[in-house]
Amino acid sequence: MYWDKGSLYKEMDRIYDVCIGCRLCFNLCPSFPALFDSVDHAGDRKREVAIAEGRVGKAIDRSDYLDLPEGEHASDASIEVEFRGEVTDLTEDERWEVVDLCYQCKLCDPVCPYTPGKDHEFQLDFPKLITRAQAIRTKERGIKFNDRFLANMDFAGKIGSLFGPFINFLNKIKILRIFMEKLLGLHRHRILPKFQTNTFSKWFKTHESNIPDPIDKVVIFGTCFTNAHDVALGKAAVEILEHNGVECIYPKQQCCGAPYLSPGDFKGFEKQARPNVDELSQWVKDGYKIVVTGPPTCSLTLKKEYPDYLEMNEKIQAISENTFDISEYLIYLHKQENLDTNFKNEIGTVNYHVSCHLKAQQMGFKGRDVLKLIQNTKVNLINRCSGMDGGWGMKTEFFEPSMKVAEQCVNDINKRDADIVCSDCSLASHQLKQASDGDVAPSHPILELHKAYGFSQNTGK
């Protein structure tokens, strides 16, 4: 039934109908306003047809009813119910616009009162509905070239590590960006993350570590973004962990596969994920925990998407139960009284942007908690999505709505005075920097912790 389009439409109607009646998620992402507006406009279309057919007179503005004598035009007012938009009134384009505008921030999951795990008969999972719709459409039409390109982050990282400075230079040439927009669907004005030739994996191979009696041992899941674009974050995470007596290893790994889920490429996702499952599960079996040092999307994928979209087994369950976001793991150490909190430097007041995919993991604000360990630190929560979501915000057709979401987040940040801005998500930081023309350039809680310890930028000691 999963792949049956009729079954999909039936479930789509059910979930859309619940959302229309609730509208609690009206301000979370462009998908919900598109749904609500389309249904409301469908009602307007029904009214216009009735007026054209002479079945009713020209509709009175709703506000005018309040000024009429009691009972007058009561029949006109009651007939408005007939012109209320319904899910079944949506056109095919309107139905699928809701799908396309969902960028899987998953903020609706903790907000919605009807999601699985909550005691309600509706059992509504909007993000999974959208993924199912994308998967069925992809199965029918095939995977678009730009979706295939944007999903293969490991390939992009390898090319970038070989020709980083040259590619970074080419990305600034206007005529080439126009060509990339036509060929790859990357918006010409999207500032792309810079590639680094000395990747995190190269650095780790030459990194010397000597912890004779570790308090714990972890596998570093570096993520494709940290490996190719944000090496400083990966290095800082390792140096902090080793400073606190944690043994770190970096075994063979590849992109978690999350970019393949966006267009519903389940085969690509499984092909990408299986080697990680085989490798990581073996280390978990040997007593290692998995610490993710990149965007929270990756820890969310290992924890929740692997169990949901791969055939569940002991290996996947072990990975899910033993995966930590880096800030989450440091708070775990702190609760075990194994985290050094003798910091040399203060960082002041922080505007902390809450990552959507950390919220989706429903584990609290661990990045904020890490920052608050540093003496005299005040943290302001910025609880709004940046609108990036990896490939979605890079695409030509979604760049503008992506930036509109980001601008709202920047406005929230600028309302609060702070010494620095932080986000657990490197991609969100990249987005906010562009949306603010460089005025907002978020750091990462781990980088700020690294500074607070007084570590050298190069050696960590």
Whereabouts are the PLM-identified features?
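Short helix-capping and inter-helix turn/linker motifs at the boundaries of alpha-helical repeat units
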Residues: 5-7, 89-90, 247
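Non-heme iron-sulfur electron-transfer modules
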Residues: 1-2, 27-101, 115-146, 439-451
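Cysteine-centered iron-sulfur cluster-binding motifs in ferredoxin-type domains/subunits
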Residues: 11-32, 94-116, 156-160, 228, ...
